[in-house]
A protein has these predicted regions:
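Active-site-adjacent structural elements in enzyme catalytic cores
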Residues: 2-163
Length: 163
């Protein structure tokens, strides 16, 4: 653990090796597709074809020990967390901003902007491990800017933690 950092998610990996073809984002990261396009002056492909060619793309790469359940709607996330806590599971709820959580649910806050969420993401996943949670219900940030990279990491954490 290198401690707190400003960006949080790892670097963006871009493949520029195919002459005449647009660059391809192999792994979204702290530098967004929009930022790359602004520098290059033309679009980049956001989805690579074929098998993964970048590190950090395996589903389990980001998975904490707790099962991760990504839920888009805060009310649905609260209901899911409450039900699982009532069933006896040690449950956490990771949200962009502070919310009042049901009894038996541990609140974890990532940050109310995609950038703040990205900077806090890995610390919150490790905190879920330190707390010994069985389940971490996650409300992701919007799918814009670095939020795309955060959602990618959350999807991988959820896939890698599926029980």
């Amino acid at each position: 653990d290198g401690g707190p950092c400003d960006v949080g998610v790892e670097s963006t990996i871009v493949d520029c090796s195919e002459e005449g073809a647009p660059p391809v984002i192999l792994r979204p990261g702290g530098v967004t597709a929009e930022q790359i396009e602004a520098v290059l002056g033309h679009p980049v492909r956001r989805t690579p074809d074929g098998p993964s060619r970048a590190p950090g793309m395996l589903p389990a790469h980001y998975a904490p020990h707790a099962q991760v359940l990504v839920v888009e709607d805060i009310d649905a996330a609260l209901a899911s967390a409450a039900a699982r806590a009532r069933a006896g599971e040690r449950t956490g709820l990771l949200t962009p901003r502070a919310v009042t959580v049901p009894e038996g649910v541990t609140a974890l806050v990532a940050g109310d902007t995609p950038e703040a969420y990205a900077a806090a993401l890995y610390d919150r996943l490790r905190e879920a491990d330190r707390l010994g949670l069985d389940l971490l219900v996650v409300v992701p940030p919007p799918a814009e800017g670095v939020g795309v990279a955060v959602r990618d990491r959350l999807a991988r954490a959820a896939a890698g933690s599926a029980r």
